[in-house]
């Protein structure tokens, strides 16, 4: 990126949910030229609780060349993507955009599973697809990405395949895209693209994410901490249904296959397997 400081956040990781964005953000933030926002997903340009530009800017280290806002909430609502994109452009017309994509069906299932585990959803996947539009919207990659390409130019939008984040070619493309002066010192560790088969009670979820637990967990061996966590998870044999019915399959094919065809025209890697997988539903 341009080495002249603009005093504006210049890098936005906007999507897609459950496609390795957390891992990628942490990886990018490990580079000494990049400052990752102090809080996860500030969503400042999307009706954030951060009321002023000063409060937003206070979340970054301005001694570094690049400030990174990793907020997948910017692309959660397809109807609002144009507004968010324009808001980013109005804030910084020279911003660079990074967008990770994943097998759309795997992403939907992973997104649904996460929502179920958190207690946000208590219905089957079929019912969730009807009532929670964002499950499908977040897999409409072309419709989302094309807005950013149209606004910022293709040269300022980097599209990455989550399955290939650990590849040397991917890391090289990031270095070139951001015009970094030296390579990264670590690899990308994929975390949030992984799925689990357990559901945690809300009470335990709150405990395991509060500051007290964060402090005391370092007082015990990792084996004990893992044992405690695993014993508070409940296997989700009941309630969680991942099987798609005929209606859901037809909706997914109708909505996502055209997206994949259009997407193939703007990415530099093969996604034909994703398209074929949708056709076989």
Language model regions located:
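Generic structural signal for small/hydrophobic residues in well-ordered secondary structure
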Residues: 20-21, 56, 68, 88, ...
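PAPS-dependent sulfotransferase catalytic core
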Residues: 1-77, 91, 95, 115-120, ...
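Histidine-centered beta-alpha loop that forms part of the nucleotide-sugar donor binding/catalytic region
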Residues: 39, 71-73, 102, 162-163, ...
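Short catalytic/ligand-binding loop motif for oxyanion handling, primarily in non-cytosolic enzymes
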Residues: 22-23, 75-78, 105-110, 166-171, ...
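Surface-exposed cleft-lining segments at the edges of enzyme active sites
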Residues: 71-76, 126-136, 243-250
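Alpha-helical packing segments of well-folded alpha/beta enzyme cores
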Residues: 52, 56, 84, 141-145, ...
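The conserved 3'-phosphoadenosine-5'-phosphosulfate
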Residues: 146-250, 254, 269-281
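Conserved phosphate-donor/acceptor-positioning beta-strand/loop module used by diverse small-molecule
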Residues: 91-110
């Amino acid at each position: 990126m341009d080495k002249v400081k603009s005093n504006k956040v210049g890098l936005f990781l906007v999507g897609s949910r459950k496609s390795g964005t957390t891992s990628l953000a942490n990886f990018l933030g490990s580079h000494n030229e990049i400052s990752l926002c102090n809080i996860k997903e500030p969503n400042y340009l999307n009706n954030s609780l951060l009321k002023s530009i000063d409060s937003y800017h206070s979340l970054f280290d301005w001694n570094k060349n690049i400030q990174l806002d990793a907020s997948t909430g910017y692309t959660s609502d397809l109807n609002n993507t144009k507004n968010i994109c324009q808001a980013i452009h109005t804030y910084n017309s020279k911003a660079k955009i990074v967008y990770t994509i994943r097998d759309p069906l795997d992403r939907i299932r992973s997104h649904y599973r996460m929502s179920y585990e958190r207690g946000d959803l208590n219905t089957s996947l079929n019912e969730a697809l009807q009532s929670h539009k964002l499950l499908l919207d977040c897999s409409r990659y072309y419709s989302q990405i094309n807005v950013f390409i149209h606004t910022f130019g293709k040269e300022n939008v980097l599209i990455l395949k989550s399955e290939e984040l650990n590849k040397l070619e991917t890391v090289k493309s990031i270095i070139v895209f951001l015009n970094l002066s030296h390579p990264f010192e670590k690899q990308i560790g994929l975390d949030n693209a992984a799925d689990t088969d357990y559901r945690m009670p809300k009470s335990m979820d709150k405990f395991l994410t509060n500051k007290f637990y964060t402090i005391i967990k370092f007082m015990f061996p990792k084996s004990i901490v893992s044992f405690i966590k695993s014993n508070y998870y409940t296997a989700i044999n009941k309630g969680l249904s991942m099987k798609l019915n005929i209606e859901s399959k037809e909706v997914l094919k109708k909505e996502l296959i055209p997206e994949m065809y259009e997407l193939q025209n703007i990415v530099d890697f093969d996604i034909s397997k994703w398209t074929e997988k949708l056709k076989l539903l």
